[in-house]
């Protein structure tokens, strides 16, 4: 069934249309990818879904219009996100950093048992008492994903989770994302520049350019579509070989 639906969504900053009459659907239990050139409006779409900006059009979650709701209400409804640059709490331990997420979730309060489960799930058990500021890049990414999972989301939105990662770290994060989807049954939306990551992880891929939808289809069809190659994949064909 359709879990999230964007209907004719438009966002202007002055005269610039960052998102231009964009419509798409995300089905429950799936991994949905969003890609496009730099400045295509991908992160703006995330900011609209999670209540950071007002906009024209509608966004529906579980059939309910969430347009215009503040971010904390959207988090409580079951939508969690991460950011391109890991947002950590340098003065807190890993355990406390993940606990912060549980306070903002649907349950509306700290759940130590759930926090423990999340720490184990994202494989930060050994770092539990460590200061978050001392984590390496992979650890910080896992912490941010863990804090989002602690909210008990129905949708987890990942914004370029592989940014800055080496091949081994990318493999590690891809495994974690697959487990979140398959083992926890959480629907995932992922923005990513690495097309190989998107073709391996996602079941549906949306390509946008200048805030407009170019194509939404299964990854194999998307990467071979001439419109997509022209707008986005011109320099990335080598990555697919």
Identify the residue ranges that each predicted region occupies.
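Glycine-rich phosphate-binding loops of nucleotide-dependent enzymes
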Residues: 1-240
């Amino acid at each position: 069934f359709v879990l999230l639906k964007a209907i004719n969504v438009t966002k202007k900053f002055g005269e610039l249309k960052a998102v231009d009459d964009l419509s798409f659907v995300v089905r429950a239990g799936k991994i949905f990818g969003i890609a496009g050139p730099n400045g295509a409006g991908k992160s703006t779409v995330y900011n609209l879904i999670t209540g950071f900006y007002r906009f024209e059009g509608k966004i529906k979650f579980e059939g309910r219009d969430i347009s215009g709701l503040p971010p904390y209400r959207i988090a409580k409804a079951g939508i969690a996100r991460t950011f391109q640059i890991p947002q950590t709490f340098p003065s807190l331990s890993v355990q406390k950093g993940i606990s912060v997420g549980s306070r903002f979730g649907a349950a509306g309060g700290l759940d130590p048992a759930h926090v423990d489960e999340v720490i184990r799930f994202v494989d930060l058990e050994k770092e539990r008492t460590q200061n978050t500021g001392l984590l390496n890049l992979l650890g910080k990414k896992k912490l941010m994903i863990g804090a989002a999972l602690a909210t008990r989301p129905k949708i987890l939105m990942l914004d370029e989770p592989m940014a800055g990662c080496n091949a081994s770290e990318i493999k590690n994060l891809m495994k974690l994302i697959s487990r979140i989807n398959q083992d926890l049954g959480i629907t995932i939306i992922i923005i990513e520049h690495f097309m190989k990551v998107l073709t391996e992880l996602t079941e549906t891929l949306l390509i946008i350019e200048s805030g407009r939808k170019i194509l939404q289809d299964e990854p194999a069809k998307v990467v071979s579509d001439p419109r997509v190659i022209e707008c986005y994949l011109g320099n990335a064909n080598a990555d697919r070989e």
